[in-house]
Amino acid sequence: MTRILLVKSIVKINMFDPKTQRLKDLFFKYPDRIQELENIFNKKTNVYIDYANVKPWATKLGWHIEPKRLKQFLDSFDNINVIKFYNGTLSGDIESEEFMQGVKKFGFDVHTKPVKIMRLSIDVSSIPPNSPDILKDFIRKPLLQKLKIEAIEFLNNQLKQFNKQGVFFIEDLKCNFDVEIGRDMLIDYDKNGIDNFVLWSGDSDFADPVRQLLNDSKKVAVFATARRVSTELGELVNNGLFIFDIQKIRNFICWKKEMESE
């Protein structure tokens, strides 16, 4: 009881009002991390989560971001105005549809659209063994140009083995929100009086809107993990961009069973 009262007394001085008992306990344990975030959220702040970019971070991190806990955590900061969540919905896929329904129930400002299913040919029956025509749909041009003929022939032979098994196409899921997020950030600056912008993504496509906000003296922070921030965004640190490593807040936002013990 004494511990909880102490936490509450500290909270009153700050902008952090924990929404759950777990957050209260973690606040008491990691006050410096909360203070760092309060400095980022020091004025009216909007958060933009590019979930298609964020979800794969689990492989690198070794732990998963739990949307419900993330929402509770961010809601605990008084200056957070809205938390916008961008993610595609795969029509007819129960898991995808239920996930998005759950996100809406958590109270996020949800932005979604149908995931496009692209069928890409891997049929090499009509091209020479050393042709890059099929591979160019899967390998970026700068890298493809550096591959030796032997490498191209090897990869085409691998595709040929798939063809022998009756596989001539693969499906690629596409649903990009770069344009929508960049647009919304600029609209929120121009019309909604937002002072601070927090982007959960390390994608290079956000470099232009982030640069514009920084040039207009707005505070912008990218929340990401090590080596998941593009070179284009990283270069904007010299312009005032702040990069926050989400590893610092693991226990606040991860699955309960993945919490670190100290």
What feature does the model see in each segment?
Residues 112, 117-262:
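Nuclease catalytic cores that cleave nucleic-acid phosphodiester bonds
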Residues 9-154, 170, 214-228:
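Domain-level signal for Mg2+-assisted phosphodiester chemistry and nucleotide/NA-binding surfaces
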